[in-house]
A protein has these predicted regions:
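Short, small/acidic-rich helices and loops at N termini and domain boundaries
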Residues: 2-44
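Aromatic/hydrophobic pocket-lining residues that form π-stacking "cages" and hydrophobic walls in ligand
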Residues: 14, 84, 175
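Short gly/ser/thr-rich secondary-structure transition/capping motifs
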Residues: 48-52, 132-136, 205-207
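Short, well-ordered alpha-helix to beta-strand connector turns
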Residues: 64, 92, 148, 219-222
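Hydrophobic/aromatic beta-strand patches that form the interior of the parallel beta-sheet core
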Residues: 67, 96-98, 128, 187, ...
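Conserved inter-motif catalytic segment of the P-loop NTP-binding fold
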Residues: 91-166, 170, 177, 229, ...
């Protein structure tokens, strides 16, 4: 969902509203958030944080990187992935979105929710919403992709859900080698395990990934985790 103004402008409006109507600041923030299409101010802040994090992560990505964005449902990982694709295309790179979760209409709606018409990038965005998405199909589809192409895969845990597909670890290693060989950037969106407790840790980390099947998490050169507006960006040492 596109904001009508930068977050600091919206917060300024909330402060003015609080003074003018003599209401608590948190109530004013919630009113502004509602006007922007959010249920309360924490969701508005989370949306703004995701937008900023997308630009920061994109600026850090290099050809050959294999990155991961992890969050619980509703905390912005898919929108962040879409925003990174838009950043890549605006920078003149090709982009690709492979999803086992959404239909083409769903993806179009995701782009529209951040104020972007997907048709604007016709010819620059490769989209695959089929059930056949796997490391093998991705590599075949991108065999001629130029260096700098940015790829988002939605999402990690679904890659080997169908039993006829190779093990998750094998697929991720294959995509890692492909990324390095071709100079493309591969980003996985990932679920967080239900055991994650935000009361003891404000933002999940690599230890909180939901991994029904084994995977060496050291494979990721960069990671980003999101939770209620908190963002943690890290590069492998």
């Amino acid at each position: 969902m596109r904001l009508s103004a930068p977050i600091y402008h919206l917060k300024r409006r909330a402060k003015l509203l609080s003074r003018e109507q003599k209401i608590p600041l948190h109530e004013a923030l919630d009113r502004i958030a509602t006007e922007e299409g959010f249920h309360h101010c924490s969701l508005l802040s989370a949306r703004a944080a995701t937008t900023t994090a997308a630009a920061k992560l994109f600026a850090q990505l290099r050809p050959g990187d294999i990155a991961l964005i992890g969050a619980r449902p509703g905390h912005g990982k898919t929108l962040m992935g879409v925003e990174i694709l838009v950043e890549a295309m605006k920078a003149g790179h090709r982009a690709a979105f492979f999803t086992l979760e959404f239909t083409e209409k769903d993806v179009s709606d995701l782009f529209r929710s951040i104020g972007v018409d997907m048709a604007t990038f016709d010819g620059h965005l490769d989209l695959d919403t089929s059930d056949t998405v796997s490391a093998d199909s991705i590599m075949k589809r991108l065999v001629a992709a130029p260096a700098g192409t940015t790829v988002v895969i939605d999402y990690l845990q679904l890659l080997d859900q169908q039993r006829h597909k190779p093990a998750l670890a094998d697929q991720v290693q294959a995509l890692r080698a492909f990324a390095r060989d071709k100079g493309v950037v591969v980003i996985f969106l990932s679920q967080i395990d239900r055991s994650y407790d935000s009361s003891s840790k404000p933002c999940p980390d690599i230890e909180d990934l939901r991994l029904p099947n084994p995977l060496d998490v050291k494979v990721f050169s960069k990671t980003c985790f999101l939770h209620e507006g908190t963002v943690r960006l890290r590069s492998a040492s």
